[in-house]
Amino acid sequence: MCEHRSISIVFEAVCFPAACATGSSFDRELLRSPLCGRNFEYLSEDPYLAGELAASYINGVQSQNVGTSIKHFAANNQENERMSVSAEVDERTLREIYFPAFETAVKKAQPWTVMCSYNRLNGTYASEHKWLLTDVLRNDWGFEGYVMSDWGAVRNRVKGIIAGMDLEMPGSGGANDRAIIQAVQEGSLKEETLDLAVERILNIVYRYAENRRNEEFSREKDHQKAAEIARQCIVLLKNEAQVLPLSANEKIALIGGFAEKPRYQGGGSSHINSHAVPCAVQLKDQYGNMTYAKGFTTDGDQYEEALEKEALEVAGQSDKIVVFAGLPDVFESESYDREHMRLPNCQNQLIEKLTKLGKPVIVVLHNGSPVEMPWVDHVYGIVEAYLGGEAVAEAVMDILYGRANPCGRLAETFPRQLEDNPSYLNFPGMQKQVNYAEGIFVGYRYYDARKMDVLFPFGYGLSYTEFSYSNLTIDKSRIAAKDTLMVSLDVTNTGSMEGKEIVQLYVSDKTYSASRPVRELKNFAAVTLKPGETKTVSMGLDYRAFAWYDTEQKDWYAAGGTYEICIGKSSRDIVMCTEVVLENEKEKLPKIDENVMIGDLMDCAKTADYVEERLMP
């Protein structure tokens, strides 16, 4: 079945959790605005986390002789006018926020292909952007595969080849082939440039062919693996009075259309024709005493009085109420952006009415990006399931009843309202241009710098057990630029249930040599512990972990001085810190042009003597 700009293949496949969910696993084995229609395809608002998870995924897939294609390169952070909008982004922001996930993926995993985006970057289409596709991707990072276009993203095939875009998708019916031949004949396209593009494509074809092997697979085993992954991705956001886990002896009201028809994947080109999609209603008898009422439909925002009345009656006869809420498919998808961060009004209204029955209410959310929660202070529990793949219902039920311990952590900040988002005044732009005016202050970098109250911070997530941290140590008190600093600490499970803890390592620049975020995630580790068990966790920090991108020197730079090393349970919950001194012999030179001041030159040891010799009598 062929459609415009896409191919829908009618095969059954196992649908694993979407990127919005897997990012919350913080398990190795960029989000700008919460309104972006394809946020469910993005791993995290944090470039370090996104890069590490992407590299691990690529290495795993390609170990099976299956190629990966990372996309969309670059600054493709909205669906509105995505075919033509120009993302206006300064180089420091690109290098620190929007490039690192791609850079890490390339350097650590070498994906077979990179897909360039539809949009323009600072005025030039990504498919024709030589600085992007050749200078940065190949020369700076060492990418060895081929670059392909997004579907129909080629504007000028010859310019694309010259820039480093090798493969056009889905093809032009021969029109661009003729343009290439003509350009070679006229001399505007060098034959060796064309040959290089062909060689890059053939190298991947040969790599696959030489390692091709027959594989057997089991949809049932893969479904169980999807359930296992989904359990690792679920984030417990609230658990007041230990309302969770549920007991099999309690009478539970199961409310909401998503309990019968879970939203488990995003719309558009990422859609999977799934093998099997169990729902909570089908599974309820395997877990406890549960009664179901629909309450609302899942295909929009239509209030239906009869459904609400039935839900309130069923809920009134229960001990606890579990509401399966979320965003309908039509609220977020490829090709358009969200208009707001709200759940459908019919869902919010029903949740509020349920909280007034005097029974504990737990909300399970199915959504691809943050939502506002006007009822957050009135419910007892919140379980963020995201778009958890075809086995998400099984995973959610396991979490609700304590058969699994939640260990997911938010890979993005949940602001209290849309207006708090740093891109609010500039998204989605106007007149085919969007200005990334917030610069490097994206996600928690912005909220933490502003000391802004948020609904739930980056890295946040609860467990059914408790963990304590102790004995934070670093292997050196002073390091040189070439050194790797090793950070170690002990983590103890002080609760009564086995669980996994996500230890987050943040770095804070105390040299004040440039405008920097309050702290940035620079490493993390997952550790599974039995009750009473203690393990030592060690993480490394290299020079890049301390550095920022200096656009004047065109390089990463970390000033000599003091840096704070912090261990946190989220970007806001910092448990312990220590300090290290970085000794950097490389001094930042002032930019010498018509705007340089004498004071700038005198502040730099490498230019001060020169200035003194010429100014002193």
Predicted segments with their positions:
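Glycoside hydrolase catalytic-domain context in secreted enzymes
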Residues: 1-547, 562-567, 571
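Conserved, compact domain cores that house catalytic/ligand-binding motifs in diverse enzymes
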Residues: 596-617
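Terminal connector regions
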Residues: 542-587
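Low-complexity, Pro/Ser/Thr- and charge-rich linker/hinge segments at domain boundaries
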Residues: 583-603
